[in-house]
């Protein structure tokens, strides 16, 4: 079964990599082999997927498309506990006291760097992912992104499932990367990324601070995010059509359907 699945996966990946506007920039053969091991049940535990990339690369959109497509398939075929999402942003340290002291989040952010991995408790995130992979239910933290910098701990139950997926700026950094079976990096051109950032900044009413925020994020990305691409099994194009991502995921799910349903 493993040999058959690996052969089919190689063909599916080959066809996509050689298509116009492919979703892939790079795929390691070891990633395809590992996927075949999971799909053939040679590895019987849950698998974990980490998706990283700089701000406005498209990683959150890609992660949600993966989650929604798999959940739709799971509902159709009555598969329980198909996929669980771990939100990396929920692991930002609680800095609500510092926000209050500064008078506003904007003032706080001028003196506190949120664009470095040290701003997040990534060791706790790794612990939670490992616990889920061992079949345990975990209570996750929840970080308030509205500007209070409040993090409430042990509030969101996460249940063990077949796939644990997480995306974030620092998902492939040293303190957490070993938690993932599949390491994915989303690559995007500078011009597209900048355009997306400023569109989002306008929606969030960043005003005059947008330039400063963008410059800081870009500079820190060169140090903390871009180098993590070297750890990736798969590099995706953050500029590919969303429909192309869904189509590819459905091809993998069609193989699952052929084998097990």
Regions found by a protein language model. Give the residues of each.
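NTP-dependent small-molecule kinase module
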Residues: 5-43, 159, 178, 195-202, ...
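Hydrophobic positions on the alpha1 helix immediately C-terminal to the Walker A/P-loop
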Residues: 62
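The conserved Walker
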Residues: 55
């Amino acid at each position: 079964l493993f040999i058959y699945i690996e052969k089919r996966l190689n063909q599916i990946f080959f066809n996509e990599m050689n298509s116009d506007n492919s979703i892939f920039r790079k795929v390691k053969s070891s990633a395809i082999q590992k996927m075949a091991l999971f799909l053939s049940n040679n590895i019987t535990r849950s698998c974990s997927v980490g998706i990283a990339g700089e701000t406005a690369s498209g990683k959150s959109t890609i992660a949600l498309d993966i989650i929604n497509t798999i959940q739709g398939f799971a509902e159709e075929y009555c598969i329980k506990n198909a996929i669980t999402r771990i939100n990396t942003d929920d692991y930002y340290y609680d800095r609500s006291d510092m926000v209050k002291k500064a008078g506003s989040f904007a003032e706080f952010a001028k003196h506190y760097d949120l664009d470095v991995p040290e701003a997040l408790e990534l060791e706790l995130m790794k612990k939670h992912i490992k616990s889920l992979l061992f079949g345990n239910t975990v209570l996750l933290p929840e970080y308030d992104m509205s500007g209070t910098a409040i993090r409430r701990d042990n509030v969101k139950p996460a249940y063990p499932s077949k796939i644990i997926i997480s995306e974030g700026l620092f998902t492939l950094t040293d303190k957490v990367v070993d938690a993932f079976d599949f390491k994915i990096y989303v690559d995007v051109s500078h011009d597209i990324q900048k355009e997306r950032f400023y569109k989002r900044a306008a929606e969030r009413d960043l005003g005059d601070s947008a330039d400063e925020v963008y410059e800081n994020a870009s500079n820190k990305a060169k140090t903390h995010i871009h180098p993590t691409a070297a750890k990736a099994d798969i590099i995706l194009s953050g500029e590919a059509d969303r429909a192309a991502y869904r189509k590819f995921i459905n091809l993998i799910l069609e193989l699952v359907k052929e084998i097990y349903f």
